[in-house]
């Protein structure tokens, strides 16, 4: 069997799908994308196709290493996201050829179902509470919320009080009937993160995500030393080499690699195993589409330390398409009390509606995250 073609489809709301075709008619699907940089990743995928056309798709490890090592310059969000989507598609092909789900090729299940959580947007507490109640009625009891708005390097007590009051109101509305993590989104400097985390401790969030940017990862250990709250990070780390430094430094309790950014299944299985050796939990980042979610699930179901799986059903970013709109076998991704079962079909287990993908790709938006500014006019972290 030989790889014959790679085709990319940019799609609403902000996704990109990849189809890898073979000379024997077996196709694999992947989801290589950086939110807001889909065209750039698309170009990288097609550059990497030079290493793939005419090659045996079953040699996933060799193809991964070739894509990673054959170029003198490597790593980073664009190249690793391109590799990630290609890697997902290769695993999809291999599972389909052998007639088994990918998790069977990775050693089999370590659990029967995986707990998921839902991201809830909204700037006002009333909006967040309403969103959480709607999801709670559908069986969710684990959520992730924005921890704060933009903050200056040294900000005011008023800014801290506003962030804390918002969380206090949400906790008061639900008591201990729900769990929620707080995502700082890298918006907070190290000095302010230390203050804000301490003030939030009484409300017992499940974790604090990206309290500072990944570029400031050396700060995680210092922050962790001043709080009992678990620190989560990893969505903006792109290889096991990035995660190696974080694990060695300590401070992070939950790793959050993104299966569409951090090299795909091949790389993230290694990252999960590294985390287990340090007694660190795994909770893959996934505000993306169905192929990315399926890839996450295959890693979750073979990783003993996987504890939570993000999923994007109903997320506010999904303007123009919902999580399962491009999927025929929607029932296979049904949530039961906030849990999801292992994928059933061979490969990644996602039956893509290719005709719909082709049609909707004609109207793909160029999504960009907003640009925020501080009161003094300087650019703020989003």
From Swiss-Prot:
Binding positions for Mg(2+) per the UniProt entry: 183, 209, 235
Superkingdom in the source lineage: Bacteria
GO molecular function, one term: magnesium ion binding
Pathway the protein takes part in: Carbohydrate acid metabolism; D-galactonate degradation; D-glyceraldehyde 3-phosphate and pyruvate from D-galactonate: step 1/3
EC number: 4.2.1.6
Cofactor note: Binds 1 Mg(2+) ion per subunit.
Gene Ontology terms: biological process: amino acid catabolic process; D-galactonate catabolic process
Pfam families named among the record's database cross-references: MR_MLE_C, MR_MLE_N
Reactions catalysed, as given in the entry: D-galactonate = 2-dehydro-3-deoxy-D-galactonate + H2O
Site residues (Transition state stabilizer), renumbered to this chain: 310
Stored SMART domains: MR_MLE (SM00922)
Requisite cofactors: Mg(2+)
Site note Increases basicity of active site His, residues: 258
Keyword vocabulary terms for this entry: Lyase, Magnesium, Metal-binding
InterPro entries, A to Z: DgoD-like, Enolase-like_C_sf, Enolase-like_N, Enolase_C-like, Galactonate_deHydtase, Mandel_Rmase/mucon_lact_enz_CS, Mandelate_racemase_C, Mandelate_racemase_N_dom
UniProt key word Magnesium: yes
Active site, renumbered: 185 (proton donor), 285 (proton acceptor)
Job of this protein: Catalyzes the dehydration of D-galactonate to 2-keto-3-deoxy-D-galactonate.
General remark: Reaction proceeds via an anti dehydration.
Similarity section: Belongs to the mandelate racemase/muconate lactonizing enzyme family. GalD subfamily.
HAMAP family: Galacton_dehydrat (MF_01289)
Protein name: D-galactonate dehydratase
Natural source organism: Ralstonia pickettii (strain 12J)
């Amino acid at each position: 069997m030989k790889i014959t073609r790679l085709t990319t489809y940019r799609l609403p709301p902000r996704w990109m799908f990849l189809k890898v075709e073979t000379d024997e008619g077996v196709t694999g699907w992947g989801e290589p994308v950086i939110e807001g940089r889909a065209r750039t990743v698309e170009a990288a995928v097609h550059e990497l196709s030079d290493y793939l056309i005419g090659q045996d798709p079953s040699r996933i490890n060799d193809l991964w290493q070739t894509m990673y090592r054959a170029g003198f310059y490597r790593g980073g969000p664009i190249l690793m996201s391109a590799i990630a989507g290609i890697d997902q598609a290769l695993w999809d092909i291999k599972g389909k050829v052998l007639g088994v789900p990918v998790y069977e090729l990775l050693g089999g299940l370590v659990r029967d179902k995986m707990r998921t959580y839902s991201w809830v947007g909204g700037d006002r507490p009333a909006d967040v509470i309403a969103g959480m109640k709607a999801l709670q009625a559908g069986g969710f009891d684990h959520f992730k919320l924005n921890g704060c708005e933009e903050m200056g390097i040294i900000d005011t007590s008023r800014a801290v009080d506003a962030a804390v009051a918002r969380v206090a109101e949400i906790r008061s509305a639900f008591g201990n009937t729900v769990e929620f993590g707080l995502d700082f989104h890298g918006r907070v400097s190290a000095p302010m993160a230390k203050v804000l985390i301490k003030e939030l401790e009484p409300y017992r969030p499940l974790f604090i995500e990206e309290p500072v940017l990944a570029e400031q990862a050396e700060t995680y250990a210092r922050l962790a030393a001043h709080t009992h709250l678990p620190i989560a990070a990893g969505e903006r780390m792109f290889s096991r080499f990035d995660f190696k430094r974080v694990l060695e430094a300590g401070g992070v309790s939950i790793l959050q690699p993104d299966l569409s950014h951090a090299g795909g299944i091949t790389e993230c299985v290694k990252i999960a195993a590294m985390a287990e050796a340090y007694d660190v939990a795994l909770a893959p980042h996934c505000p993306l589409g169905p192929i990315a979610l399926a890839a996450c699930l295959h890693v979750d179901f073979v990783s003993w330390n996987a504890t939570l799986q993000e999923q994007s059903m109903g997320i506010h970013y999904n303007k123009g398409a919902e999580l399962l709109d491009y999927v025929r076998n929607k029932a296979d991704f049904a949530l039961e009390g906030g849990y999801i079962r292992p994928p059933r079909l061979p490969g990644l287990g996602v039956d893509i509606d290719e005709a719909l993908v082709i049609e909707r790709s004609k109207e793909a938006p160029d999504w960009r995250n907003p640009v925020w500014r501080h009161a003094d006019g300087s650019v703020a972290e989003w």
